[in-house]
UniProtKB/Swiss-Prot annotation:
<dbReference type="GO" id="GO:0005737">
    <property type="term" value="C:cytoplasm"/>
</dbReference>
<feature type="active site" description="Proton acceptor">
    <location>
        <position position="73"/>
    </location>
</feature>
<feature type="site" description="Important for substrate specificity">
    <location>
        <position position="74"/>
    </location>
</feature>
<comment type="function">
    <text>Nucleoside triphosphate pyrophosphatase that hydrolyzes dTTP and UTP. May have a dual role in cell division arrest and in preventing the incorporation of modified nucleotides into cellular nucleic acids.</text>
</comment>
<keyword id="KW-0546">Nucleotide metabolism</keyword>
<dbReference type="GO" id="GO:0009117">
    <property type="term" value="P:nucleotide metabolic process"/>
</dbReference>
<feature type="site" description="Important for substrate specificity">
    <location>
        <position position="18"/>
    </location>
</feature>
<dbReference type="InterPro" id="IPR003697">
    <property type="entry name" value="Maf-like"/>
</dbReference>
<keyword id="KW-0378">Hydrolase</keyword>
<protein>
    <recommendedName>
        <fullName>dTTP/UTP pyrophosphatase</fullName>
        <ecNumber>3.6.1.9</ecNumber>
    </recommendedName>
</protein>
<feature type="site" description="Important for substrate specificity">
    <location>
        <position position="156"/>
    </location>
</feature>
<dbReference type="InterPro" id="IPR029001">
    <property type="entry name" value="ITPase-like_fam"/>
</dbReference>
<keyword id="KW-0963">Cytoplasm</keyword>
<comment type="similarity">
    <text>Belongs to the Maf family. YhdE subfamily.</text>
</comment>
<dbReference type="Pfam" id="PF02545">
    <property type="entry name" value="Maf"/>
</dbReference>
<dbReference type="GO" id="GO:0036218">
    <property type="term" value="F:dTTP diphosphatase activity"/>
</dbReference>
<dbReference type="GO" id="GO:0036221">
    <property type="term" value="F:UTP diphosphatase activity"/>
</dbReference>
Length: 195
């Protein structure tokens, strides 16, 4: 188990249960303070630009003096199209049909912020879906799982059945690339300790 020790509280600017669980899994104590921001691009952006813009916006929205804030935003990108969370079952089915049998990218923008110090970066993972049977799409869309996830699927849940191959950081697809975050947290005074 990895224990992280810090003199400053780490604030997670997200209500995502997956992000919270990943931080707990690697032993990073944190406080949850979701950012209430409009998740909309001010002008056309690439997936990388968009997730960096939103992660910065989220971090700045919850930041208080002295605190270290961790904010992230994840999207699925296919052919320059950004797929966020589906609003309803028809939107989820449309996403599954778009992604079926194809390779897409999962892009997460991460911002670490403390006072005037800010570091923002992206991590991209390539995911290939199988040809998804229509019956699987319908069954999955009937669950609650797709509707709070970029691209409408959770690789760590039933949506993992769609995944044929992955190239890159698995945890990035879940919603938080824990290795690069852990390495960068060291520069903010949060040192990993193995116990």
């Amino acid at each position: 188990m990895i224990l992280m020790i810090t003199q400053h509280p780490l604030i997670l600017a997200s209500a995502s249960p997956r992000r919270t669980e990943l931080l707990r899994q690697i032993g990073v104590p944190h406080t949850i303070r979701p950012a209430d921001v409009l998740e909309e691009a001010p002008y056309p952006m690439t997936a990388d630009e968009y997730v960096m813009y939103l992660s910065r916006k989220k971090a700045r929205a919850v930041a208080k003096p002295g605190e270290i804030v961790l904010a992230a935003d994840t999207v699925v990108a296919l052919d320059q199209q950004i797929l966020e969370k589906p609003a309803d079952q028809p939107a989820a089915l449309e996403m599954f049909r778009l992604l079926s049998g194809r390779t897409h990218e999962v892009v997460t923008g991460v911002t670490l912020l403390q006072d005037e110090r800010e570091e923002t970066f992206t991590v991209t993972t390539t995911v290939r879906f199988c040809e998804i049977p229509e019956s699987w799409m319908l069954s999955y869309a009937a669950t609650d799982e797709p509707y709070d996830k970029a691209g409408g699927y959770g690789i760590q849940g039933k949506g993992g059945l769609f995944v044929e191959a992955i190239d890159g950081d698995y945890y990035n697809v879940v919603g938080l690339p824990i290795n690069p975050i852990s390495r960068r947290l060291e520069a903010f005074g949060i040192e990993p300790m193995f116990a």
